Amino acid sequence: MISMLFPRSPLCTAAIVFYTCVCIPLGRLKKNGGDADAHDDDGYNLVGVMFGDKEKEEEICCPICLVEFEAEDAVTHLPRCAHLFHINCIEPWLLRGHLTCPLCRSFVLAPTPPTQNVNNAHSSSTLYLSIFFFFCIFLHLLGYL
């Protein structure tokens, strides 16, 4: 928007650099809850269970490897669609970056509800504004503004 109003303004350049270098990384950090290790597990928390007699009545097989489930197999249900897979079959699928169930293509992860209260939203916007003003003063001192 600023670039449309002031196409050759240093303020436009400062706003774009600020948004790219500060707002986007801070937004990602806030989205991850401030956890630096959030990318390590990609948010997949599968609960493994042992395949038992209750499931055996259905005589079903793993949709990935097409091998029938047997007693004591390590299996898991995907959280949203509840499809059953061998853990050793579904983990490589998810770790390769697939975000959907290989059977029905529904998203694996349920959207997380926002847990941020109004005070946190206000303080983060205040942080963004103060960083922006500091950045503008810095550019002014360097002679760009």
UniProtKB/Swiss-Prot annotation:
One of the protein's GO biological processes: protein ubiquitination
One GO MF term: zinc ion binding
Zinc finger (RING-type): 62-105
Catalysed reactions listed for this entry: S-ubiquitinyl-[E2 ubiquitin-conjugating enzyme]-L-cysteine + [acceptor protein]-L-lysine = [E2 ubiquitin-conjugating enzyme]-L-cysteine + N(6)-ubiquitinyl-[acceptor protein]-L-lysine
GO CC terms, sorted: membrane
Protein origin, superkingdom: Eukaryota
Signal peptide: 1-29
Main location: membrane
Compartments where located: Membrane
EC number: 2.3.2.27
Membrane topology label: Single-pass membrane protein
Pathway: Protein modification; protein ubiquitination
Transmembrane portions of the chain: 125-145
One Pfam family this sequence matches: zf-RING_2
Key words of the record: Membrane, Metal-binding, Signal, Transferase, Transmembrane, Transmembrane helix, Ubl conjugation pathway, Zinc, Zinc-finger
Family: Belongs to the RING-type zinc finger family. ATL subfamily.
Record comment regarding domains: The RING-type zinc finger domain mediates binding to an E2 ubiquitin-conjugating enzyme.
Protein name: RING-H2 finger protein ATL18
Gene from which this protein is expressed: ATL18
